């Protein structure tokens, strides 16, 4: 099946992939379970990485159990829908408790049940410059998105919140604020990159779990970018080419911090920084754009 790269559809003012927009209504009837764990991110912020870390924690670090199915089958993607592929809600029906779930939805579109049940959330935030570069490459290879156009026009659309899932700025801020009323562990991609063991220990504490030191070391090793890029259960190469074309750009491209410097021009960087300073003026947390 060839995808025609349909335009984004706005739901409550949030632009979404056309097929994903169709799930927002049905998702409102979704029933969360108290022992669910939600992984929330803006796209291209380490969702798959965190999904694999958490599945390894849930499986006690046993590699063969984590190889039971591709990551998107082990951690259902709530709003996912695509012709010819099981939807996120369909995958959920096959998922036994305790369930790991993932979403990129902003709070305004999140199923209310997740909030009512006080489902624990692990949120990963990544610096905007690396996100937008990664997102541009992802738009090019993932054909459910509209054509991204030129890099310069995509950058403008990102700053204006006119890309799938809307404003990065609003997303990272509203989930940060949710910490005051909801059990949210807010992590930074750059911190996990810098010291994965330290961050995994934070996750274990948040979940009220413990693992032997050697198991934690094994999780660090097997969730490294190199290992995950080689692993067909995590690198999305099992998705049909007509949906994701890895010849255009691999799903797991570089996984670094600071790669934006290879894409932004000096003028684009100045424009982005000025807009960022204005948009994030009320923000009480800081991102690192290089390590």
From Swiss-Prot:
Liver, kidney, heart and colon. GO terms for molecular function: 3'-phosphoadenosine 5'-phosphosulfate binding; aryl sulfotransferase activity; flavonol 3-sulfotransferase activity; identical protein binding; steroid sulfotransferase activity; sulfotransferase activity. Sulfotransferase that utilizes 3'-phospho-5'-adenylyl sulfate (PAPS) as sulfonate donor to catalyze the sulfate conjugation of a wide variety of acceptor molecules bearing a hydroxyl or an amine group. Sulfonation increases the water solubility of most compounds, and therefore their renal excretion, but it can also result in bioactivation to form active metabolites. Displays broad substrate specificity for small phenolic compounds. Plays an important roles in the sulfonation of endogenous molecules such as steroid hormones. Substrate binds at residues 102-104. Keywords: Cytoplasm, Lipid metabolism, Phosphoprotein, Steroid metabolism, Transferase. 3'-phosphoadenylyl sulfate binds at residues 44-49, 126, 134, 189, 223-228, 251-255. GO terms for cellular component: cytoplasm. The N-terminus is blocked. One of its GO terms (biological process) is ethanol catabolic process. The modification Phosphoserine is found at residue 134. Belongs to the sulfotransferase 1 family. The active site is at 104 (proton acceptor). It is found in: Cytoplasm. InterPro entries: P-loop_NTPase, Sulfotransferase_dom. This is Sulfotransferase 1A1. Induction: Induced by androgens and suppressed by estrogens. The expression is under the influence of pituitary growth hormone and thyroid hormone. It is an enzyme of class 2 (transferase). Pfam families: Sulfotransfer_1. It comes from Rattus norvegicus (Rat). Homodimer. Its EC number is 2.8.2.1. Transmembrane segments: none annotated. It catalyses: a phenol + 3'-phosphoadenylyl sulfate = an aryl sulfate + adenosine 3',5'-bisphosphate + H(+); 17beta-estradiol + 3'-phosphoadenylyl sulfate = 17beta-estradiol 3-sulfate + adenosine 3',5'-bisphosphate + H(+); 4-ethylphenol + 3'-phosphoadenylyl sulfate = 4-ethylphenyl sulfate + adenosine 3',5'-bisphosphate + H(+); 4-nitrophenol + 3'-phosphoadenylyl sulfate = 4-nitrophenyl sulfate + adenosine 3',5'-bisphosphate.
């Amino acid at each position: 099946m060839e995808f025609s790269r349909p335009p984004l559809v706005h739901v409550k003012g949030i632009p979404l992939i056309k097929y994903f927009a169709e799930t927002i209504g049905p998702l409102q009837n979704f029933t969360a379970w108290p022992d669910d764990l939600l992984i929330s991110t803006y796209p291209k912020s380490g969702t798959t990485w965190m999904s694999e870390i958490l599945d390894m924690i849930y499986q006690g670090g046993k590699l063969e159990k984590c190889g039971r199915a591709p990551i998107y089958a082990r951690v259902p993607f709530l709003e996912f829908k695509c012709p010819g592929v099981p939807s996120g809600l369909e995958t959920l029906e096959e998922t036994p408790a305790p369930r790991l779930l993932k979403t990129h939805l902003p709070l305004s579109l999140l199923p209310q049940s997740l909030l009512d049940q006080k489902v624990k959330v692990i949120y990963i935030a990544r610096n905007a410059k690396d996100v937008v570069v990664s997102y541009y490459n992802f738009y090019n290879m993932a054909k459910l998105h509209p054509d991204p156009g030129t890099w310069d026009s995509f950058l403008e659309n990102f700053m204006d919140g006119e890309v799938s899932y809307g404003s990065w700025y609003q997303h990272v801020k509203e989930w940060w604020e949710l910490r005051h009323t909801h059990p949210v562990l807010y992590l930074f991609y750059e911190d996990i990159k810098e010291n994965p063991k330290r961050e995994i220990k934070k996750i274990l504490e948040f979940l009220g779990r413990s693992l032997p030191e050697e198991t934690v070391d094994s999780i660090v090793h097997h969730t490294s970018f190199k290992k995950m890029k080689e692993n067909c259960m995590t690198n999305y190469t099992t998705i049909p080419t007509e949906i994701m074309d890895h010849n255009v750009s691999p799903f797991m491209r570089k996984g670094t911090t600071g790669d934006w410097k290879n894409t932004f021009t000096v003028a684009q960087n100045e424009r982005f920084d000025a807009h960022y300073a204005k948009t994030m003026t009320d923000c009480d947390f800081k991102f690192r754009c290089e390590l």
